[in-house]
Curated annotation (Swiss-Prot), chain A:
Protein name: Assimilatory nitrite reductase [NAD(P)H] small subunit
Gene: nasE
All residue ranges annotated as the Rieske domain in the record: 8-104
Database matches in PANTHER family: 3-PHENYLPROPIONATE_CINNAMIC ACID DIOXYGENASE FERREDOXIN SUBUNIT, FERREDOXIN-RELATED
Annotated catalysed reactions: NH4(+) + 3 NADP(+) + 2 H2O = nitrite + 3 NADPH + 5 H(+); NH4(+) + 3 NAD(+) + 2 H2O = nitrite + 3 NADH + 5 H(+)
Induction pattern: Positively regulated by TnrA under nitrogen-limited conditions. Induced by ArfM.
Keywords assigned by UniProt, alphabetized: 2Fe-2S, Cytoplasm, Iron, Iron-sulfur, Metal-binding, NAD, Nitrate assimilation, Oxidoreductase
Lineage of source species: Bacteria, Bacillati, Bacillota, Bacilli, Bacillales
Species whose genome carries this gene: Bacillus subtilis (strain 168)
InterPro entries: Rieske-like_NirD, Rieske_2Fe-2S, Rieske_2Fe-2S_sf
EC number in record: 1.7.1.4
Keyword S-adenosyl-L-methionine among UniProt keywords: no
Binding site for [2Fe-2S] cluster: 49, 51, 68, 71
CDD domains with a match to the protein in the record: Rieske_NirD_small_Bacillus (cd03530)
Record's subcellular location: Cytoplasm
């Protein structure tokens, strides 16, 4: 369904997303890392670490944070901000759960 | 045969300790016979409360198993009670009509639990808490019934109550006195304890006297003297113990409350001794274990004709963790006309400390909530220390490390450090100096010290520090594993074992992690420790694996992966090379490179292609990415080489096949060279083997990376089988004692080569370690094959989502 200002794209069934692990999702020209956290909520961020472009989808997840597998930068899945002592941020995306499915909203 | 007949009546802790002491003095002097009324070998009765809690198995509390009796030529009769001693003819008679002559006799009949002489005490569901049978009764009842009543709010009753709570029962504790544990605590500490235990879920009925146990065949409730009553499906009587003097009395041996003994544990009848709870010494029959171990020592020396100081009675100290609450009491702890107290009471933190003085001498102490000062105060009480020089309040403050003198430095080697297990200072020093123990954990494993209540651990550490001096690195033992916790690696591993924890999330939860889901440091570490401790049952937590180990491939900087198939010993053939070549072409893999480990690396494979690449290769994973065995490099060796004295390729391949996939604290690299020219570079490997004429040399702790280190010569062996066996023992010891992410080089520097050698030279330890290693190896499966069989996991990990909007 498309309306004027907001696009909603289906990523898949929520039960198909592995828990506390990332999934690489390609939408148009974007590459996202989508995480299903242990509390069942969904987070999506761009799949590139601001340090050297590492793939965040493969990182270890703890609570609301993911650790980049390349050099262990710690990134918030809430607001995309890289935690001290490092600096930077990643783009975050909004997601929506409807019934059995997860949607990306942008 | 010439040996004297020694008969022990009673197979419990005190009696058997006396036998152990006798054996250590005069192994072959006596022909020993033991009679035990219970059907079990010698076990630690005190740990029954842990069995009740579900924490521990019966076999874990066994002090001496059936083998011990055989190994020491002791004739053991279980399930047999001695009913009479014929002091004239020097024989004992049992209920199986057996007549056993003796030259020397020891009575160690222990205590009988006191059962209230009230109507209903013989109903089903009413039990004491003395032996394994009682414990089984309580465990069985907890599965069927809900309400438990414990009569007796002393030490034993509270331990029983804690156990029953753990089993899911509703527990009420009935006590005659106005506060709990009045034998060990004063009113203030007793009430603090009650508050704590009520928070844990226990209900208390104080100043209540039970008049009748009501019910039909089975108990249904209790009725009290004041007319009130409660319901109960299980009643545990923990109202006290009485020395078991029946045998003594029936045989004409003088008894009072207990069997009367002198300062050398002799009864009034020649050649008959008594020890333990059944004995009465200077009017006291002891119910705690530390004095009984002291008695056993004196008895043994006296019986063997060795000069010994007489037993003069014990100053009692109790250090307990009742239900997780720290409680300590020692000496004479109640105030009176001549005895005055100094108290510190912190209501906010729930800490209460009191010392009792007679004039300027410290005679007693009670600590609640923080009992870390217990050992120091007890030492002062035993020495009848004069405190006139010390400022009053500072007695109760912990002394700083430099300012205070160490407690243990002033102790003689004979003095007992661990009261629960009767371990002396000398025994601990021996363990350090002769057996190479260099941590409290190792001393615990070697001597048993600090393995029960744990209260003596600070003293054990002190002795370690003094004995090892600058070699003792306290900080290595205490470093927290990451910022999420204050616990060190040893502490975490201990807790996992003690509490039977089985998932990373459970560990972080139960041990109070600051962050509930940990961090990139501790999650993989916990996953490793859990799997190391329980290899067959633990289910690996893939979310706690670093990406390489989760994907079973090496991630590259651009998000592609490298694939390294197994090439045992660096040996290949045309079939495998053709398979590899075909796969490279089919998947257009950009880079093919030889690795340092003597195999082929296919670099630049896309994530979603990995399962198909593995399927087409049809070779096992080379684990080039893991905290595991990497490779066993080899030189050509005697199969072709002019110089090789041994077949290095065959041994290398055997080693790699045996240990592939083993989870280790960090990567392990091995090599086998066929002669000292060392073409396989065995000198810089975690475990390197070098062939010599007639055998192999094993080198350990080498490292060819950032911290270059030459390996140390561990040992020389003759056969391939020995190499495999000792490699297994060595690696298992590394797995069990190293910190996660500690290479063998760092670990070996820390624990010391001679210590490792002493472990490997101990046949018993070798057997145990190899047993655990083989158990671990038995569950290994090739991960690439696994993925091919588990389509769902493959999809979750390797497939990307590509949407169409």
């Amino acid at each position: 369904m498309v309306n004027k200002d907001v696009t909603k794209v289906c990523i898949g069934k929520i039960e198909e997303l592995p828990e506390q692990l990332g999934k690489t999702v390609y939408i148009e020209d974007k590459e996202l890392a989508v995480f299903k956290l242990s509390d069942g909520s969904i987070r999506a961020i761009e799949n590139r670490c601001p340090h050297k472009g590492g793939v965040l989808a493969e990182g270890i997840v703890s609570g609301q944070y993911v650790f980049c597998p390349m050099h262990d930068w710690k990134i918030s899945l809430e607001d995309g901000i890289v935690q001290e002592p490092d600096h930077g941020c990643v783009k975050t995306y909004e997601t929506l759960i409807e019934g059995e499915h997860v949607y990306l909203v942008y | 045969m010439g040996k004297k007949q020694l008969v022990l009546v009673g197979n419990g802790m005190a009696g058997v300790r006396a036998i152990e002491e006798i054996l250590s003095i005069a192994k072959d002097e006596f022909q020993i016979t033991i009679f035990g009324a219970e059907p079990h070998p010698n076990y630690n009765r005190i740990l029954l409360s842990k069995v009740l809690q579900g924490d521990t198995d019966i076999k874990d509390i066994t002090l001496n198993d059936w083998d011990w009796y055989e190994e020491n030529n002791i004739q053991l009769y279980t399930n047999e009670t001695v009913i009479k001693v014929d002091t004239e003819n020097k024989t004992v008679i049992t209920d199986a009509d057996r007549i056993q002559p003796y030259d020397e006799l020891i009575l160690a009949t222990g205590s009988v639990p006191f059962i209230l002489p009230i109507p209903g005490a013989d109903k089903k569901g009413v039990t004491a808490f003395r032996d394994i049978k009682d414990t089984d009764t309580m465990l069985a009842a907890s599965k069927q019934y809900k309400k438990a009543a414990v009569i007796g709010g002393g030490l034993l009753g509270l331990e029983a109550a804690r156990g029953l709570l753990n089993l899911g029962m509703d527990v009420s504790v009935i006590h005659l006195a106005p506060f709990l544990m009045e034998r060990q605590l004063d009113a203030t500490a007793g009430r603090l304890l009650q508050n704590e235990l009520e928070k844990q879920g226990m209900t208390f009925l104080l100043e209540k006297q039970t008049e009748e146990i009501v019910g039909d065949d089975r108990v249904e409730g209790l009725r009290f003297k004041d007319g009130t009553s409660i319901e109960a499906d299980l009643v545990v009587m923990a109202v006290g113990i009485r020395p078991n003097t029946t045998l003594g009395a029936e045989s004409g041996i003088p008894v009072n409350r207990g069997i009367i003994v002198n300062d050398y544990m002799q009864t009034e009848i020649p050649h008959i001794y008594a020890v333990g709870e059944c004995a009465e010494h200077r009017g006291i029959a002891y119910g705690l274990v530390a004095p009984l171990y002291e008695q056993a020592k004196v008895l043994a020396k006296h019986m063997c004709g060795i000069e010994t100081k007489p037993y003069e009675g014990s100053v009692l100290s109790t250090q307990l963790k009742v239900s997780g609450v720290e409680v300590f009491s020692a000496g004479d702890f109640n105030e009176s006309e001549e005895k005055k107290a100094i108290k510190v009471f912190d209501e906010q933190d729930g800490i209460y400390k009191k010392i009792v003085l007679r004039g300027n001498q410290i005679v007693g102490a009670v600590l609640f909530g923080d009992s870390s000062e217990g050992n120091r105060l007890f030492s002062m009480i035993q020495k009848e220390a004069d405190i006139s020089e010390t400022s009053k309040i500072s007695i109760l403050q912990p002394l700083s490390q430099e300012a205070g003198t160490s407690i243990t430095a002033a102790m003689s080697d004979d003095e007992i450090i661990c009261g629960c297990n009767g371990v002396s200072k000398g025994a601990i020093i021996q363990a350090i100096q002769e057996k190479g123990c260099s941590s409290t954990d190792e001393i615990k494993a070697c001597t048993g010290a600090s393995r029960s209540c744990g209260g003596c651990k600070p003293l054990v550490e002190e002795i370690l520090q003094h004995t090892l001096g600058s070699d003792f690195d306290a900080s290595a033992q205490k470093e927290a594993i990451c910022g999420c916790t204050t616990l060190s690696r040893d502490e975490v591993v201990e807790e996992i074992k003690a509490k039977g924890l089985s998932h990373t999330r459970e560990v972080m939860n139960v041990l109070g992690w600051k962050t509930p889901e940990g961090c990139s440091k501790c999650r993989p570490a916990l996953n490793y420790y859990l799997g190391m401790i329980n290899p067959t049952k633990y289910e690996d937590d893939r979310t706690s694996r670093f990406v390489n180990e989760r994907m079973h491939a090496n991630i590259q900087k651009d998000g592609t992966y490298s694939v390294v198939p197994r090439m045992y010993g660096g040996v290949t053939n045309s079939t495998d090379l053709r398979k590899i070549a075909d796969v490279v072409d089919k998947y257009e893999i950009p880079l093919v490179k030889m690795t340092g480990g003597q195999r082929i690396d296919l670099i630049g494979v896309k994530k979603e292609d990995l399962p198909k690449v593995w399927e087409d290769l049809d070779m096992p994973s080379g684990y080039a990415y893991g905290k595991t065995l990497r490779t066993v490099k080899t030189c050509v060796g005697e199969q072709f080489c002019r110089f090789g004295t041994q077949d290095s390729m065959a041994l290398g391949i055997a080693l790699e096949k045996k240990f592939e996939g083993l989870n280790t604290p960090h990567k392990v690299k091995m090599a086998v060279s066929a002669c000292p020219r060392n073409c396989a570079e065995s000198g810089i490997k975690d475990l390197g083997v070098v062939g010599i004429d007639g055998g192999w040399e094993l080198y350990v702790g080498g490292n060819g990376g950032t911290h270059l280190r030459a390996g140390d010569l561990l040992m020389k062996v003759k056969t391939n089988e020995e190499v495999l066996e000792y490699a297994g023992t060595y690696l298992q010891y590394y797995r069990e004692t190293a910190n996660y992410l500690e290479r063998t080089s760092a670990w070996l520097e820390r624990v010391g080569l001679s210590h490792v050698q002493s472990v490997l030279n101990d046949p018993e330890k070798r057997q145990e370690l190899n047993g655990r290693m083989n158990e671990t190896l038995s569950v290994h499966k090739d991960p690439w094959k696994d993925f091919l069989e588990d389509k769902q996991t493959s999809k979750e990990l390797f497939e990307n989502v590509v949407t169409t909007s």
